[in-house]
Amino acid sequence: MVVASAQTLAERLGYPPGAKLIIVHADDLGETHAVDAAATKALEGGMVTSASLMVPCPWFPEIADYAKSHPDADLGLHLTLTSERVYYRWGSVAPADKVPSLLDDNGYFYHDWAKNEAINAKEVEIELRAQMERALSMGVRPTHLDSHQYRLIMSGKELFEVMLRVAHAYKLPIFVTRDWFAEYPYLQTSLGPNDIVLDHTVTMEPGIPAEKWPEFYLTALRNLKPGVTEIVIHPGYDDEELRAATRERSTWGAAWRQRDYDFFTGDEFRQALAGQNIKLITWRELSRAYASLAKSGKKTE
């Protein structure tokens, strides 16, 4: 269980308690070339600070090579157990016969777990460790872990604790935020006193019209509370490849990802940060704090 102490996470990072700190985090690297190209350009521009990689996906080798050649890039793993696209699919890293409950009749991850209630927690751990080992073997040195579609966060205590166990084994922090505690109380009871817990999260909501995209993010920045907030984004280029890969729906599709890319590499975002006295940080900083907490035995609030 998370135990409160006098120090906030911001203070553990060396900032005053009232500081407003954000991680701008790009999800889904490795999914397509258009996502990889947009996300890495955004990272290099400096306003997107962190990202996570999908090891089972077809374009993971490309982003793994990028990680090797850019060792300072703040990259984690986007632990993946679903394959939500209609025609663009992926399956397990572990041998199929070791994780049968995770795979459909064609050997792909399920589109949606709601259609399969037989997910085996032991097989989930086998697959998560396989993804970790594949990434490490290809030169990726992750700074953190998170969960594609939040499946490991929001699918019950047992699977969350599998993710937590894997994270502890590899000495990595995971993306979890206090915003989720009310709806998923097992998160708070499962986390240990030395686990990193972010304060808030922001992500684009389905149904926001394209013309309201900047307003949504600018409002979130104006209303930002003190503490550490992760803004989860999904950058990509609205090109033929990404349109084909995501054609079954507009949500998190090619145009959606282009809008995220445009806003977070544009002047409006840069000016908003300066105007609101908001500081960009990375998961690498949190990873160092996590290592320090584990070594010292101190606790964050």
Residue ranges and their predicted role:
Residues 21-23, 48-52, 72-78, 142-146, ...:
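Structural preference for beta-strand elements that scaffold enzyme active sites
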Residues 121, 125-213, 222:
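Catalytic domains of cell-wall/extracellular-matrix polysaccharide-remodeling enzymes
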Residues 174-177, 249-301:
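C-terminal domain-boundary segment and adjacent tail
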Residues 33-58:
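A short alpha/beta connector and helix-capping loop motif
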Residues 29, 56, 78-84, 148-150, ...:
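Active-site beta-loop-alpha junctions enriched in small/polar residues
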Residues 12-14, 39-45, 62-74, 91-104, ...:
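Acidic (Asp/Glu)-rich catalytic clusters
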Residues 1-23:
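N-terminal pre-catalytic segment of deacetylase/amide-hydrolase enzymes
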